[in-house]
């Protein structure tokens, strides 16, 4: 993988990630394909929304279908027929999400399979091995996602363990002679001094890119913005920066304002299945009764297949009847909406009018632009 920083405006960065499997324009949003599929979509449909890179889930793909089935096909690209690059998370967040059913030790994490209740152990080395078998273009280190809230001491202990696991991840990745990219993950909760320690340790180990982890786990937006404003300037300028698990459309804009290049989130797909559809002015709740007789498209400004061919009335009908097509059309629209935002951000950066884009983005939502700490 090669990263090229093409242009900057303030902290916002316009760049390019170059892989053997294709080029990814940044800032980029990655749809989430947890089980080797973006729910309800064919790979061709996902590509048509503008997506250039997908996220796969190491933890879930390890449990089902497992490494052996994956290797029968070649790798995850072959298994799901996605021709472009794939980033896989390490499984750390999913293990963190298991709550009381898991036990964290220095060696790794003991837990019970959410599929069949079997006792399972995962560590940094195992995560690297699974991701190697998946053929991931971007491999994430195995880390511990610090919960919120956490005391300074709890966050410090968690962050220090993540650093040791990062070192083990790097060593195993190098032992495999994996030709792909390995990203480190900055932890430290909402504490700036701990983020400093994490960044220093990770950059000393050396990675192809750096993720900011442990955010969007329940902390106030102000804390997320503060940590991003503090952390991003500490990261190497010539490496991509990835904000994990984020987020709402405004979170993408705020992340870019603070120097982030890559995002992923289940929100556009999950919300689509629940009838919450993103449009230029905000959100349409398609199951509301008022849409029953509305023959207009979902978003007149959208060029997606759904908006070009169907009315709000039809989408409302599909939702009320619980038709699979409704979830599919909604997902096509929401994914395209996210990709249109990213394309608009990239164009605004190319044309040196990113600040104007931000003002217009919030004006259309009747909201104030959130404050940004001066450079």
From Swiss-Prot:
An MF annotation (GO) of this entry: tRNA-guanosine(34) queuine transglycosylase activity
Keyword field contains tRNA processing: yes
Function, as annotated: Catalyzes the base-exchange of a guanine (G) residue with the queuine precursor 7-aminomethyl-7-deazaguanine (PreQ1) at position 34 (anticodon wobble position) in tRNAs with GU(N) anticodons (tRNA-Asp, -Asn, -His and -Tyr). Catalysis occurs through a double-displacement mechanism. The nucleophile active site attacks the C1' of nucleotide 34 to detach the guanine base from the RNA, forming a covalent enzyme-RNA intermediate. The proton acceptor active site deprotonates the incoming PreQ1, allowing a nucleophilic attack on the C1' of the ribose to form the product.
Necessary cofactors: Zn(2+)
RNA binding: annotated span: 245-251, 269-273
Reactions performed catalytically: 7-aminomethyl-7-carbaguanine + guanosine(34) in tRNA = 7-aminomethyl-7-carbaguanosine(34) in tRNA + guanine
InterPro entries to which the protein is assigned, alphabetical: ArchSynthase1/Queuine_TRR, TGT, TGT-like_sf, tRNA_ribo_trans-like
Subunit structure: Homodimer. Within each dimer, one monomer is responsible for RNA recognition and catalysis, while the other monomer binds to the replacement base PreQ1.
Name of protein: Queuine tRNA-ribosyltransferase
Entry's cofactor comment: Binds 1 zinc ion per subunit.
Family membership: Belongs to the queuine tRNA-ribosyltransferase family.
This protein's pathway: tRNA modification; tRNA-queuosine biosynthesis
Keyword RNA-binding: no
The gene coding this protein: tgt
Chain sites annotated for binding substrate: 89-93, 143, 187, 214
